[in-house]
C-alpha cells in the first residue's frame, strides 16, 4: 500500500530535520533554497496553505525564504518562530497587498473560498499587487473542470482568474485541482452507519484528490524549474462516485453496504454535481511529486478508526 501523506502529523522539528538532510554541505538547499528567491504563500493560515508551508520546509526551503500572508497572521506564530516572515494581507483590501508581497519572487496564489466574496475581483487585486511588488512567477490553485472547457458555474471564477494572470505579464502555473477527497470520510461513515448507499448510473464520477496531495504539488512546482506557463490537472488516480465510495468503505471497514437504486426524483446534486467536466484523472501529480496520488481506498485505510467510529 502506498503511504498516504495525509496521515502524517509530523512535528515542525522533524520537518526541519528532513529539510536539513536535503541541504548541501555548503548550507544551501540543493534544489529549493534561497537562490531561487523568496516564496510568498497567500492564505498561509488556511488548511491548504498550512500544508504547503510544511511541505516547503520538508523540502529544505529555509524558513527565512518564506513570506506567509494571511488575514490572520497571528495564527502563523509557529512558522514565525522558525524565521518565516508573517504579514497581514487581505485580497478585499488591496492597499494591504503590495507590502505583504514585497520581496517575493514567487507567489502561491491560493484561491479564496467559494462564497467568500467576488472571487475574480479579489484575485485581480492580488495579481495587480504581485506585479507591483515585482513577483516573477504566480502559481494559482485553479479548478480541474477548466481542462475540459468548462468556463461557467464553479469553474467560471477560476477561468476568469487564469485569464487575468496570463495577461499580467508574469510567468504562471495553473494547478487545476480536483475536489478534495478528505470530505468523503464522513460520507463513507454515514453509509456504513446506515448499511446502505443509494447509487445510480447517472452519478457523477470525479477524480477526487487529497488536500495533502494538492499541497505536495504546489510545493513541487514552487521548488523546481520548468513549470513556467504550464497548466496541470491535480487529481487522484481513479474516477470515483457513490458506488465506488461505498465499495471502498465496505472493504476497509469490513462491514457490508447495500447498494440500492437512487430515487429517480432524488437530489440532482448527488447525480449531476460536476458532470462530465469533473471526470478527469491525470498523471500530472506523479510527474511533479515523484509518487502516485493517494487513492480514496488509501484515504479510508488511513482513517479507518474514524470510519468505524462514525459507523456506530
Q: Which role does the model predict for each range below?
A:
Residues 21-29:
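C-terminal segment of classical bacterial N-terminal signal peptides
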Residues 112-113, 304:
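Short glycine-/small-residue-rich Rossmann-like dinucleotide-binding loops
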Residues 253, 263-312:
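A hydrophobic C-terminal alpha-helical subdomain
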Residues 8, 211, 242, 295-296:
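Structural motif detector for alpha-helix initiation sites
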Residues 35-70, 74, 92-95, 100-102, ...:
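Oxidoreductase cofactor-interface core, primarily capturing Rossmann-like NAD(P)-dependent enzymes
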Residues 80-93:
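Rossmann-fold cofactor-recognition segment
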Residues 6-15:
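N-terminal export leaders
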Amino acid at each position: 500500500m502506498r503511504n498516504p501523506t495525509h496521515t502524517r502529523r509530523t512535528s515542525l522539528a522533524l520537518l526541519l530535520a528532513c529539510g536539513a538532510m536535503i541541504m548541501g554541505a555548503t548550507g544551501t538547499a540543493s534544489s529549493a533554497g534561497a537562490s531561487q528567491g523568496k516564496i510568498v504563500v497567500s492564505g498561509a493560515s488556511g488548511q491548504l496553505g498550512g500544508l504547503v508551508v510544511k511541505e516547503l520546509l520538508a523540502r529544505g526551503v529555509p524558513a527565512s525564504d518564506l513570506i506567509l500572508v494571511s488575514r490572520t497572521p497571528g495564527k502563523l506564530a509557529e512558522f514565525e518562530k522558525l524565521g518565516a516572515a508573517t504579514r497581514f494581507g487581505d485580497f478585499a483590501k488591496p492597499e494591504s497587498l503590495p507590502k505583504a508581497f514585497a520581496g517575493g519572487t514567487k507567489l502561491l496564489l491560493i484561491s479564496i473560498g467559494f462564497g467568500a466574496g467576488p472571487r475574480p475581483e479579489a484575485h485581480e487585486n492580488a495579481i495587480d499587487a504581485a506585479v507591483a511588488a515585482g513577483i516573477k512567477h504566480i502559481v494559482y490553485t485553479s479548478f480541474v473542470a477548466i481542462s475540459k472547457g468548462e468556463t461557467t458555474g464553479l469553474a467560471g471564477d477560476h477561468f476568469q482568474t487564469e485569464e487575468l494572470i496570463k495577461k499580467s505579464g508574469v510567468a504562471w502555473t495553473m494547478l487545476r485541482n480536483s475536489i478534495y477527497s478528505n470530505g468523503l470520510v464522513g460520507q463513507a461513515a454515514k453509509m456504513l452507519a446506515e448499511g446502505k448507499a443509494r447509487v445510480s448510473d447517472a452519478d457523477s464520477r470525479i477524480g477526487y484528490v487529497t488536500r495533502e496531495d494538492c499541497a505536495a504539488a504546489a510545493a513541487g512546482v514552487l521548488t523546481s524549474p520548468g513549470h513556467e506557463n504550464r497548466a496541470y490537472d491535480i487529481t487522484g488516480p481513479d474516477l470515483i462516485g457513490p458506488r465506488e465510495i461505498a465499495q471502498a468503505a465496505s472493504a476497509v471497514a469490513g462491514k457490508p453496504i447495500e447498494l440500492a437504486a437512487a430515487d429517480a426524483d432524488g437530489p440532482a446534486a448527488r447525480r449531476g454535481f460536476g458532470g462530465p467536466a469533473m471526470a478527469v484523472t491525470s498523471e500530472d501529480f506523479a510527474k511533479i511529486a515523484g509518487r502516485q496520488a493517494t487513492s480514496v481506498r488509501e484515504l479510508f485505510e488511513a482513517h479507518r478508526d474514524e470510519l468505524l467510529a462514525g459507523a456506530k
